[in-house]
Design a protein with these regions (language model features):
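Short, flexible loop/turn elements at secondary-structure junctions
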Residues: 18, 79, 143-145, 154, ...
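A contiguous strand-loop segment
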Residues: 1-93, 121, 126, 311-313, ...
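C-terminus-biased signal that marks the final domain/tail of proteins
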Residues: 1-13, 118, 129, 134-135, ...
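Short, surface-exposed beta-strand-loop junctions and turns on beta-sheet-rich folds
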Residues: 20-22, 81-83, 155-158, 165, ...
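Broad, structure-driven detector of short, well-ordered beta-strand segments within folded domains
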Residues: 68, 148-152, 274
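Catalytic cofactor-binding cores of redox enzymes
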Residues: 121-158
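Proteins synthesized as precursors that undergo proteolytic processing into mature forms
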Residues: 92-127, 239-247
Length: 323
């Protein structure tokens, strides 16, 4: 269970929450331009765009959850269990395994238009990485011009325009967008009294214009809530204001330990939240036990290196004592 969002002020921001009951040992990973990407069916790529994101590095290969490349294109994979159906390897097609899709796209595409052209030629297959099972995912891909959602189901590969600029999990994206119709009457303003002129109404609280906005942790509810918060969000253009506001947006769907039990004594939590300034290549993050916003700047690493640059996220809470 995860949530991803885009945000535009002076710069373009892209990020997500990763909600799960355990971590694989994630790291902030910079894949430099000359790091050899060995694709399962497409051979080796020795030169590509640099990228930064959160990944689990297995056998020297970055398995990205989310990433942004040096051109400002962002991409995140989110659970899509029960609906993701990958295709079979076909001779003569550009067969790309689901685990390598993020570096495949971000390594080649400088903008969303190029992404669309690349996806039109691609055959997305379910080849697993080593002993890992093939993760059932769908993806949000975005730049400053807009966002798309990529889903591979029993009906084949689908690319959807994503005007909301958000994504969660099930149900499929068209259903998520359709259910937003249920909230067309919501507003950040106080509601007008239209029930009846015969009954006196009192607005007894602020925020009543958004009554009916779902507050539970299901993926459909999180989609509606983060879309409302993101689309009505107001922020200054500075880096501090923009980054702070982005974390507030995704904070609206934070998962607290104890509220989503997945097995006896096991709870889904927001393991990390990311916010990448895609325009500048700066990856900000917080973790469940460390709310201090930390940053890794892609351009402070050697982007012409052949070696991954990995930083372990800070996991211990930082408390500032004022006296």
């Amino acid at each position: 269970m995860c949530t991803a969002a885009t945000y535009q002020t002076k710069d373009f921001y892209f990020g997500r929450t990763l909600d799960y009951e355990f971590s694989y040992g994630d790291e902030i990973v910079v894949t430099p331009r000359k790091f050899p990407l060995d694709f399962c069916h497409m051979g080796k790529c020795d030169a590509h765009y640099g990228m930064i994101g959160m990944a689990h590095v297995a056998d020297g290969y970055p398995l990205y959850y989310d990433a942004v490349n040096e051109k400002g294109v962002g991409m995140a994979g989110l659970n899509f269990v029960g609906n993701a159906v990958y295709q079979k390897v076909e001779e003569g097609r550009e067969n790309v395994a689901q685990y390598e899709l993020i570096p495949w796209v971000l390594g080649q595409c400088a903008n969303l238009q190029e992404v669309r052209k690349l996806l039109a030629k691609m055959n997305l297959v379910g080849t697993p990485f080593g002993d890992f099972p093939a993760a059932q995912l769908h993806w949000i891909i975005a730049d400053a011009s807009g966002a798309i959602t990529l889903e591979c189901t029993k009906d084949g590969l689908q690319v959807y325009d994503n005007p909301a600029g958000v994504l969660t999990n099930n149900p499929p994206f068209p259903m998520q967008m359709f259910q937003l119709n249920n909230y067309a009457g919501l507003s950040p303003k106080q509601p007008e009294h239209r029930f009846s002129g015969q009954i006196p109404f009192t607005s007894y609280s602020r925020g009543m214009g958004a009554m009916g906005l779902p507050g539970d942790l299901s993926s459909e509810s999180r989609f509606a809530r983060v879309a409302f918060v993101k689309c009505n969000s107001v922020s200054g253009d500075s880096e501090k204001e923009s980054v702070s506001q982005f974390f507030h947006i995704l904070g609206s769907v934070d998962q607290q330990r104890g509220c989503c039990e997945v097995a006896e004594g096991k709870y889904e939590i927001t393991i990390y939240t990311s916010c990448c300034n895609a325009s500048k290549g700066i990856y900000y993050y917080t973790t469940y036990d460390n709310h201090q916003i930390s940053a890794v700047d892609m351009h402070r690493t050697d982007l012409d290196s052949k070696t991954l640059s990995c930083d372990k996220p800070g996991m211990e809470e930082q408390l500032f004592c004022q006296n």
